[in-house]
Amino acid sequence: MDLSQQDWKTKLDNDPNAVILDVRTEDEWNEGIIPNAILNDIYKGQGFLYKLDEFDKSKNYYVYCKAGGRSAQACAIMNQMGFETTFNLEGGFSQWKGDVAFRDEN
């Protein structure tokens, strides 16, 4: 399900069963993330699918990429794999107005 930036954040903030999934590349990830996100680069192909297999399908997944296209594709793949609830962030990280975390450089 596609959600606006505000609806995505509101649902996320009130969802104890939430998992944030970033499907961008590692280079994009290094430029900043939505706090507590898990990286699973959709461009990894089979590696992306293998990592999805390790996730709990009953959780609620809040998925984002840079602009919303890859995350929409990821949500469709996840739904086909049996994930019950996925939310795509419309506009992606490029339009994100919420908190941003950066990878620890230590």
Task: Locate each region found by the language model.
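Rhodanese-like catalytic fold shared by cysteine-dependent sulfurtransferases
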Residues: 1-18, 26-60, 69-106
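Short, surface-exposed ligand- or partner-binding patches at beta-edge/loop junctions that are enriched
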Residues: 63-64
